[in-house]
Amino acid sequence: YSQILINSRPVVSALSGVYGLEQIPVNMIERVEVVRGGGSALFGANAVGGTINIITKDPINNSFQVSSTMSNMNGKVWEQYMGANASLVSKDNTYGIALYQSYRNRNPYDADGDGFSELGKLNMNTFGLRTYYRPTQFSRISLEYHTTNEFRRGGNKFDLQPHETDITEQTKHVINSGGLSYDLFWKEYKHKLSFYSSIQHTDRNSYYGAQQDANAYGKTKDLTWVAGGMYVGNFEKVLFSPATFTAGLEYQNNSLHDVMTGYHRDMK
């Protein structure tokens, strides 16, 4: 019952949230904002338990960074991670762009030797960018995009096809997400008017089955988008004290198409 937000936009659908934060690479995150409780239900029915807001990195200065780590679990399984970040900002701060890329690979881990994995096989590639342009001193246009290509599998008999095993959970995700926003400030930055739109498309091929079930293959397409506008005004005195006034309008849409041919299931 927690909603994941990307830069305050609820574009992470219930389907994308199945594996949740594990599909978001660390090197794209600037900070994480957590709101607990039903007060966050303004973002929708998925948020009655709270929200997790992922704020991605903004270009601040010219920089480049590459990192790589290797980890081992009980001397059995290796996990590899590689990440790269780069940012470029103009001298007058008129425009800037931040790029990131990450790669993660993990072999299946069987902790108790029963032949079934406690941690599944994982292979994930992610690329993204965030850029801005300031047409004037009091306006800003921002654009962001990121894509994730992920394969994961858990169960047993990893050398066989999923329908030849005792039990397998296997998914392949291709996720594309982007957003565009325009911010207009008044002088002294006491008032702000924003227009924004964000979209995310998920394409998933899956297998959830046991006992050599050849019918358990599925294919799912999911599209989520949101668009809206917001005004924020700061006033030095309203009646007897300073005040902030916020107003906005937002529209959200989520469409899902799930097909399992073996079970003659076609849901929209």
Question: Predicted regions span which residues?
Answer:
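Outer-membrane beta-barrel transmembrane domain signature of Gram-negative proteins
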Residues: T171-V174, I199, D203-K268
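Outer-membrane beta-barrel translocator/receptor signature
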Residues: S13-L15, M28-E30, A41-N53, K57-D112, ...
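Residues on the lipid-exposed face of transmembrane beta-strands in outer-membrane beta-barrel proteins
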Residues: M82-L88, L129-Y133, L180-L184, A227-G233
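Short loop/turn motifs that connect adjacent beta-strands in outer-membrane beta-barrel proteins
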Residues: P59-S63, S90-T94, Q137-R140, W186-K192, ...
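Membrane-embedded beta-strand positions of outer-membrane beta-barrel proteins
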Residues: F64-S68, I97-Q101, L129-T131, L143-Y145, ...
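Flexible loop and strand-edge segments within Gram-negative outer membrane beta-barrel domains
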Residues: R106-T126, Y132-R134, F138-L193, I199-L223
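Short acidic/polar hinge/loop motifs at secondary-structure boundaries
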Residues: S2, R9-R36
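Transmembrane beta-strands of outer-membrane beta-barrel pores
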Residues: M70-N74, S90-D92, Y103-N107, T147-F151, ...
